[in-house]
């Protein structure tokens, strides 16, 4: 279910402050965040965020196509080891 339009997009308050500080600072600085639930806003375009995946921070460079999505969509939490190989096919 989508979020109501009258509520607007959800963004943690500290995230806006960090984004403003990153705009004034150096360009290659990674802003570490733990808020995977926050929506990416147009003012975040061009900033690299380090989105926490439960283990480490994954660098995510925000582009215009990402606006409206959540930060958690770009930082996978699980690693896929691949399907187990068939033992019969492996012996041949």
Swiss-Prot record:
Keyword Acyltransferase appears in the UniProt entry: no
Q: Name one GO molecular function term.
A: rRNA binding
**Which Gene Ontology terms describe the biological processes this protein takes part in?**
ribosomal small subunit assembly; translation
* CC per GO annotation: cytoplasm; small ribosomal subunit
User: Which UniProt keywords are listed?
Assistant: Ribonucleoprotein, Ribosomal protein, RNA-binding, rRNA-binding
One Pfam annotation reads: Ribosomal_S19
InterPro entries annotated for this entry? Ribosomal_uS19, Ribosomal_uS19_bac-type, Ribosomal_uS19_CS, Ribosomal_uS19_SF
> What Gene3D superfamilies is this protein classified in?
30s Ribosomal Protein S19, Chain A
Q: Which family does it belong to?
A: Belongs to the universal ribosomal protein uS19 family.
HAMAP family in alphabetical order:
Ribosomal_uS19 (MF_00531)
Query: What is the stated purpose of this protein?
Result: Protein S19 forms a complex with S13 that binds strongly to the 16S ribosomal RNA.
| Name of the protein this chain belongs to | Small ribosomal subunit protein uS19
The source organism is Methylorubrum extorquens (strain PA1)
**The gene coding this protein:** rpsS
């Amino acid at each position: 279910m989508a979020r109501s339009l009258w509520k607007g997009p959800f963004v943690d308050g500290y995230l806006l402050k960090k984004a403003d500080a990153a705009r004034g600072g150096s360009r290659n600085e990674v802003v570490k965040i733990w808020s995977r639930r926050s929506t990416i806003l147009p003012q975040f375009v061009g900033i690299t965020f380090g989105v926490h995946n439960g283990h480490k921070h994954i660098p995510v460079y925000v582009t215009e196509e990402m606006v409206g999505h959540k930060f958690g969509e770009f930082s996978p939490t699980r690693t896929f080891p691949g399907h187990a190989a068939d033992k019969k096919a492996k012996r041949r």
